[in-house]
């Protein structure tokens, strides 16, 4: 069952417009910038999207939903609950042996890779009434979209997320609850001891590959806890945002005197804008926006973010995420880890709940402690 679209964001004063169902009935009218087309144009071409509606660990999952919404496609969303291990059920493994979400089905096609899903949707759904997110091949705009897709996809979003959770002193007005850092650090403090104990104890419910995965997971979180490493990658992020700021300035100079709305690669809204909007949204959530654009240092980036937030697809998809994350996922995560699971499971689970690493620990917690 898909998450309903009639939820209003809570505790998100910076989110400009709610995603109410009544509002979703009509796109925002922006001059010279057509919004997502109506799903009614594709009655027999609808997609089926299998995903976990409460998963915030991957930027690419968000991008898939935004692309579908921007193109205005009819899409039936079906929930695959990772906590209940539905991705390991035979019915889902028949769709994807890799046990990964999201997966889309269209006609007789089953696609599971993030980038392949985006490319398939863009390539397949075209026409007069459908927004094209990729410019014509061979055009300067097409080359720009490919360039910024590669650049934005390479950003280490999980490292930003873990680092900002563990070092809130580097953030301003983060949406992460203040109690999260202390609780996660409490679990991390005992994580190494717990892992050593499990190495010498028989745990029939834990296979060696699973335990190995947990060790790698903890090593990654501990690496992201290194302040010097975090400052290094945030410095590299600043250089990327400088490049994007300069690109947006070029668009202004190229189109001076024209009335079209300017985006990253030209007058048309493209896939590059979807990716940039999703990236800025995550950075805002983590408490990095005041440092990187709201301080006036990158006015073009700030203008871009304000405009992209007003788009119907972004209000619809991201409004639901705020509501679910703040009202359901985070509180439930902290209730679960209070039942005294091993510290390394508690730390990794809380990290996943706050948007970083995924839910490797949930199945074990649920089976052993609930």
Swiss-Prot record:
Residues 177-344 form the GST C-terminal domain. Residues 45-129 form the GST N-terminal domain. Keywords: Coiled coil. It holds the Pfam family GST_N_2. The keyword Lipid metabolism does not apply. The keyword Nucleotide-binding does not apply. InterPro entries: Glutathione-S-Trfase_C-like (IPR010987), Glutathione-S-Trfase_C_sf (IPR036282), Glutathione_S-Trfase_N (IPR004045), Thioredoxin-like_sf (IPR036249). Belongs to the GST superfamily. This is Ganglioside-induced differentiation-associated protein 1-like 1. It comes from Mus musculus.
